[in-house]
């Protein structure tokens, strides 16, 4: 996880395109590894809920991208029913699981759950607007990022 760059996920664990499901994982940095924890909170560092939402949104975004072979890109359009169910601390490892519940009219909607040691810490419904990439270079940059996260591409990244 690279909080300051909003690269929230460490790895794409599994993508099942037929089932329209994804699993991702991330480890929250130690408190001394990120200035985020200097203010949230002094003496009791907690992962901000808004950054947990970003973890869920990135998980849903990778799935939305995968379902269209990275031919168009997801742009965050909405977050519904976001819930933070437990404090997340520096050093915690989280696994996110998501699945698509709707695709159509240029939108993809997914449900995402975050867990630590099998217990729920957060969940939300994430909506994406699916749009063309602004240029081929940006599409390649996103595919390269997916490859760094170990997305299981069937063909070489172009």
What spans do the regions from the language model cover?
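Hydrophobic core residues within well-ordered beta-strands of beta-rich domains
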Residues: 6-8, 94, 108
């Amino acid at each position: 996880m690279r909080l300051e760059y909003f690269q929230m996920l460490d790895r794409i664990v599994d993508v099942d395109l037929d089932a329209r499901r994804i699993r991702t994982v991330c480890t929250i940095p130690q408190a001394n590894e990120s200035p985020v924890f200097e203010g949230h909170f002094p003496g009791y560092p907690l992962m901000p809920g808004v950054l947990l939402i970003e973890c869920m949104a990135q998980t849903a975004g990778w799935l939305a991208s995968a379902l269209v072979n990275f031919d168009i890109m997801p742009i965050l359009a909405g977050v519904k029913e976001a819930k933070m169910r437990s404090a997340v601390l520096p050093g915690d490892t989280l696994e996110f699981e998501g699945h698509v519940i709707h695709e159509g009219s240029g939108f993809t909607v997914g449900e995402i759950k975050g867990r630590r040691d099998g217990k729920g810490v957060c969940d939300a419904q994430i909506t994406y607007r699916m749009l063309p990439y602004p240029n081929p270079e940006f599409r390649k940059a996103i595919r390269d990022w997916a490859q760094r996260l170990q997305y299981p591409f069937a063909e070489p990244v172009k």
